[in-house]
Amino acid sequence: MSRSDPDPGKNSEPSKSKMSLELRPTAPSDQGRLNEAFQDEDLEEQNAPGNSTVRSRVVQSGEQGRAKQDDRQITIEQEPLGPKEGTEEESEDERQKGFLERKYDTVCEFCRKHRVILQHTIWAVLLTGFLALVIAACALNFHRALPLFVITLVTIFFVVWDRLMAKYEQRIDDVLSPGKRLLERHWFWLKWVVWCSLILAVILWLALDTARLGQQQLISFGGLVMYIVLLFLFSKHPTRVYWRPVFWGIGLQFLLGLLILRTRPGFVAFDWMGKQVQTFLGYTDAGAQFVFGEKYTDHFFAFKILPIVVFFSTVMSMLYYLGLMQWIIRKVGWLMLVTMGSSPIESVVAAGNIFVGQTESPLLVQPYLPHVTKSELHTIMTAGFATIAGSVLGAYISFGVSSTHLLTASVMSAPAALAVAKLFWPETEKPKITLKNAMKMENGDSRNLLEAATQGASSSIPLVANIAANLIAFLALLSFVNSALSWFGSMFDYPQLSFELICSYIFMPFSFMMGVDWQDRFMVAKLIGYKTFFNEFVAYEHLSKFINLRKAAGPKFVNGVQQYMSIRSETIATYALCGFANFGSLGIVIGGLTSIAPSRKRDIASGAMRALIAGTIACFMTACIAGMLSDTPVAINCHHVLESSKVLSNTTEVASCCQGLFNSTVARGPNDVLPGGNFSLYTLKSCCNLLKPPTLNCGWIPNIP
């Protein structure tokens, strides 16, 4: 054994003690504290490059001198490495604190100990103050405060519901489990009774409603049945169709439409909501006017429409930060889940598409996209094609399209998308994602509300640029295609050949089966062609022209060309166009989903075209439901009313038809009068004799022998 080695009999235990103390830093001791005048110097030496050799020098000294290292020596060497903590030091720091600092620490400690009680107290005070304001507003003018009162009640209901379900959900389930088991035992017979009763009720309602309003409702019902049959015939797996989501989806469509379009409370509520949305979006003008000047409306689309997209995107981002949008999406998704039996992923995405776009809604379930089934992936794409984003909803409203019908179409299209998707591509696999996982949604990466607003405005820049660029490109392309078709048609003495004319013949059967008036079927078919081959912006822009011409009460026919549609046809067209189902969106969906889930690229590409067709038919089915429920009177056949009898009677129908005839008549002077709508001068003279219109000089009409 070498001389430098420690004696195993004596120094084995001390050596172990020394090694353990060297590897574990000890707390500083007051006995080993250095002079305070040299504290900074010691710290600088500790941070110097040579301080790593301190431990090795101690070990070497112990080995050469065979001296025991006591705790005090180790503590002195290790003091700069350890934190300076100690009760006496803390008490010394306390004595050095000022009076205000000690009081502040006391208050902070009190708040930490009673944090829950303080939070509840603050919320109670705020809630009490808000309820006092609501009561005061109702006492002053209840009719004026009715919306605030309803919103408050709905909010309180859902907050209390969430708290009760979070705390007593299992108990409620245990109480209801006997009734649930009873229903499950007899459900095979009960479901047939329920479905047959509902079908009979719908048939009876249609019969009575048709007798009151006319036969157009039956055509819409026939169109709905036709689309269901077509989807079943061309289904991916016709024998594997699960009919519960199909019937429930159509049923929810019908119930929502019935509530909104036929009941006064529902219509008033959605009409009020639509007007509030219009008013809210009107605040965009303040920013647009400041940026673009007072004459910003001279460039209506660029400076009036597109800023609405920026504003709405900002608001949506703020609502996401607050968690309100996620809460609404979870509630709507849960409703579709328990009624339709769709998977949690499908329900969440379909509910999300009511508020966000087809590329944003898959982000709600981004972690689970690589694991969804092919049918679920098809449903996700179909839901995107069948609905529109909330950010562009305001732009369509600014065109002059009815905000009530646009909001209704957005809500009705969500269950329609699930029903169509499950019929066109039935589920043949077992979904892997559970309800609990799918309902978890992030609040975004914004750190505060102001940052969320900034991110929302910035994220709208690509969307605005995309809308403007696509409109420029598509309208230019449409003009070129029409010129080329006109040139080609002129070779056969038919220069009227155009893209609109071709689309009107392709989509005319579909538009007619939705229930539009017979004379408007080609006009609606043209709009569907615009929407399918270009985008819905182009289609709604043309629809707004028809609406404005009708409101201006101008001539309905000019040189034999119809200028606008009936109100019923406008309503059905609004529902049929309310979706992103077009070939431009096809590339957007494939690119967006592929970037989110690269492993599913092949499945996305193979199912995208079927999803586009399914989304289009979902919009058509929503239009059929609107046609069944629309109580707008069918357009009067004025040719039959005015020309079937020689003597006109002063009835409402005759007066309406004569007024339309007056508006469409062109009178240049005596004996130079051209009746509109292909009516005869005799009919025009008869209407003049009956009503004597102030806008037309009936003396200019030549005498008819």
From Swiss-Prot:
Q: Which reaction does it catalyse?
A: thymidine(out) + 2 Na(+)(out) = thymidine(in) + 2 Na(+)(in); cytidine(out) + 2 Na(+)(out) = cytidine(in) + 2 Na(+)(in); uridine(out) + 2 Na(+)(out) = uridine(in) + 2 Na(+)(in); adenosine(out) + 2 Na(+)(out) = adenosine(in) + 2 Na(+)(in)
Of the GO CC terms on this record, one is: brush border membrane
**Which regions face the Cytoplasmic side of the membrane?**
1-119, 167-190, 237-244, 323-346, 366-378, 426-460, 595-607
Q: Where are the transmembrane segments?
A: 120-140, 146-166, 191-211, 215-236, 245-264, 302-322, 379-401, 404-425, 461-486, 584-594, 608-630
Coiled coil (UniProt feature): none
**Keywords, in A-Z order:** Cell membrane, Membrane, Symport, Transmembrane, Transmembrane helix, Transport
Keyword Protein transport recorded: no
Tissue occurrence: Expressed in kidney; in the proximal tubule, glomerulus and cortical collecting duct.
Q: Does the keyword Cell wall biogenesis/degradation apply?
A: no
Membrane topology type: Multi-pass membrane protein
Q: Where are the stretches annotated Disordered?
A: 1-96
Topological domain, Extracellular: which ranges? Answer: 141-145, 212-214, 265-301, 402-403, 487-524, 545-583, 631-705
**In the record, where are the intramembrane regions found?**
347-365, 525-544
Instruction: Indicate, by first and last residue, each region the UniProt record lists as having compositional bias (Polar residues).
Output: 48-63
Which family, according to the similarity comment?
Belongs to the concentrative nucleoside transporter (CNT) (TC 2.A.41) family.
Recorded protein name is Solute carrier family 28 member 3
Q: What organism is the protein native to? A: Rattus norvegicus (Rat)
